[in-house]
Design a protein with these regions (language model features):
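Adenine nucleotide-associated cytosolic modules
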Residues: 1-175
Length: 175
């Protein structure tokens, strides 16, 4: 049986570990880097598999983390980018259909993991460009020695709250 619970609450470093503890698979559908790092770190610390995804305009990406089987989000991206280094979804815009495409791929990753079939995107970053209709599957190296959360000598032992700007309802508009 599958049970989906939703929560209308702010998630931060003080409550995320308790929130995810009882779940078999976590899906990251957040719209900002600090939240993505928070989810990654909590999932690594709690040994929880999860699917990361991100979209902006006509592009999307996703990867799946399974404890002990491949790199985590922080292995690949290290730290949140400096403020204003990357446009927010409010600034750049998000095409609603992209959420459907990438979200469906995340749902498929969860289903495959939960029923134990197929190949997951563990160790890979899948990118999609809707303008060219091209997918690319990029092999990711695992930074086992230097990753601050899943490496040989982790320095992050608890989730971290980073300053973040959340996109508003008007994020999909182009002015």
């Amino acid at each position: 049986d599958v049970q989906v619970n939703t929560y209308r609450m702010f998630v931060d470093a003080s409550n995320i570990r308790e929130l995810i503890r009882d779940y078999d698979f976590i899906i990251d559908g957040t719209d900002n880097f600090p939240a993505k790092f928070l989810i990654n770190d909590a999932c690594v610390l709690e040994q929880k598999p999860f699917s990361h995804a991100g979209i902006i305009r006509f592009k999307g990406q996703l990867m799946t983390y399974v404890p002990g089987e491949g790199p985590c989000y922080r292995c690949v991206f290290k730290n949140p980018p400096p403020k204003d280094a990357v446009p927010t979804c409010k600034q750049a815009g998000v095409i609603g259909a992209m959420g459907g495409v990438i979200g469906s791929l995340q749902a498929m990753e969860a289903i495959k993991y939960l029923i134990g079939v197929g190949e997951l995107l563990t160790g890979y970053l899948l990118t999609y460009d809707a303008l060219t209709m091209e997918f690319h599957k990029i092999k990711l190296p695992k930074d086992t020695h230097n990753c601050a959360v899943c490496g040989d000598h982790p320095t992050i032992l608890e989730p971290i709250d980073y300053e973040q700007e959340v996109c508003e309802e008007s994020a999909g508009r182009f002015d």
